[in-house]
């Protein structure tokens, strides 16, 4: 019996949970006394989240609210890639937060290299924005998952298609 088992290492997030986190952030901004009159906007688009507010202090408070709401919805904070704070018209500040999705080739190569050096019986292969890991033993795959979880990656990793 020469069956091989595999799983995919991906970096993804639940879009609906992100929509809910942004919606809850907007509701809290409207209800909090210190943020009510700041005319803050939090806009969600496919490429990222744009926060427009009156000061950097308020921007920090809104980032904290967004992070709290995202964490409560089981979203990793590593999906947020904070851009620089820009001054816009009328003494206002704006920040674009890009959303990280998918494993880029550089991080994919690092994951592959780590697996190849630590586990001789396991074969990693980069497939687009995911890394497929295959082996003849399910136990080897479980060890790979545990090892990858121990590392501090700059992106959020999920393990899918475990077969």
Swiss-Prot record:
The keyword Nucleotide-binding applies. It comes from the Bacteria. One of its GO terms (cellular component) is cytosol. Pfam families: DUF520 (PF04461). Keywords: Nucleotide-binding. The keyword rRNA processing does not apply. InterPro entries: DUF520 (IPR007551), UPF0234-like_C (IPR035571), UPF0234_N (IPR035570), YajQ-like_sf (IPR036183). One of its GO terms (molecular function) is nucleotide binding. Belongs to the YajQ family. Nucleotide-binding protein. HAMAP family: YajQ (MF_00632). NCBIfam families: PRK05412.1. This is Nucleotide-binding protein Cyan7425_1379.
């Amino acid at each position: 019996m020469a069956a091989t088992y595999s799983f995919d290492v991906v970096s993804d997030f639940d879009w609906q949970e992100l929509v809910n986190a942004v919606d809850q952030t907007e509701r809290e901004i409207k209800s909090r006394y210190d943020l009510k009159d700041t005319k803050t906007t939090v806009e969600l688009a496919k490429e990222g989240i744009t926060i427009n507010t009156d000061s950097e202090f308020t921007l920090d408070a809104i980032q904290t609210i967004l992070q709290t709401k995202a964490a409560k919805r089981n979203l990793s904070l590593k999906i947020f890639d904070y851009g620089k704070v820009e001054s816009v018209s009328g003494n206002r500040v704006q920040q674009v937060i890009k959303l990280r999705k998918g494993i880029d080739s550089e991080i994919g190569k690092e994951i592959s290299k780590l697996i190849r050096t630590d586990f001789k019986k396991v074969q990693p292969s980069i497939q687009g924005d995911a890394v497929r890991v295959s082996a003849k033993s399910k136990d080897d795959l479980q060890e790979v998952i545990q090892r990858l979880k121990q590392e501090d990656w700059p992106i959020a990793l999920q393990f899918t298609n475990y077969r």
